[in-house]
């Protein structure tokens, strides 16, 4: 892959988990960003321990050669919370714009079970036609608001949400305008569909509208536990559903080739949440960086 087109970032979720603050509570912001830089990454997404004042955050990243590339934003259009979502989005957009980011990754969290004790596979939510309409209209509006600052919006398909499966992603992309993009996540695509083939099919089908990429690997044996024991999304994470590229079942070589052949420009982000007490974040960041260097040439 071309280093002039594609840059590498890593998310702080491997150090400390915003959905389960007890995981990695001992890891400070300063430690997190220092270890990211030491591991050889040049970008970061935003976690709960990050200062939200750009005047404070930016110098701390600048001295480490890091920049902010995205920050999770939860939308609630299907619930009918349009105005509240739009107001909060504008504040979020302005923060990311001040930090120099070009992408805003959003997840539609109406009916989401990702933070609950419900079985992530058996009890996933589904939208009615009206909820789909509200979501599509909302994301079309987000794209306009993002464009005011020269930014783009990407939908983060996610386990435990109503936009998770290939079919649901297809419907979302077909119904939204072309200026609404997809934040493609290898781990969530594989986890949802259960195969490398289906994950690659999602990537190839929506290649022209992918504006951000999350790289995470999957441990099949843990997914089997999640299915057999009807576990929640977060319980699966604690047991090790996800890991860094090269440490699980996914073959990333075709992912890198497809993106490279398409002329993809932007960030690839190692975003692999697991229990830092079981998987040392710095060691796993180094492992991911080594694998990507060997397999993507970055």
Swiss-Prot record:
Cross-referenced InterPro entries: IolE, IolE/MocC, IolE/XylAMocC-like, Xyl_isomerase-like_sf, Xyl_isomerase-like_TIM-brl
Cofactor(s) the record lists: glutathione; Co(2+); Mn(2+)
Pfam family, one: AP_endonuc_2
Chemical reaction(s) catalysed: scyllo-inosose = 3D-3,5/4-trihydroxycyclohexane-1,2-dione + H2O
Gene Ontology biological-process entries: inositol catabolic process
Keywords assigned: Cobalt, Lyase, Manganese
TM spans (from-to): none
SUPFAM superfamilies to which the protein is assigned, alphabetical: Xylose isomerase-like
EC number: 4.2.1.44
Similarity annotation: Belongs to the IolE/MocC family.
Function recorded in the entry: Catalyzes the dehydration of inosose (2-keto-myo-inositol, 2KMI or 2,4,6/3,5-pentahydroxycyclohexanone) to 3D-(3,5/4)-trihydroxycyclohexane-1,2-dione (D-2,3-diketo-4-deoxy-epi-inositol).
Protein name as it appears in the record: Inosose dehydratase
Organism expressing this protein natively: Erwinia tasmaniensis (strain DSM 17950 / CFBP 7177 / CIP 109463 / NCPPB 4357 / Et1/99)
Lineage: Bacteria, Pseudomonadati, Pseudomonadota, Gammaproteobacteria, Enterobacterales
This protein's encoding gene: iolE
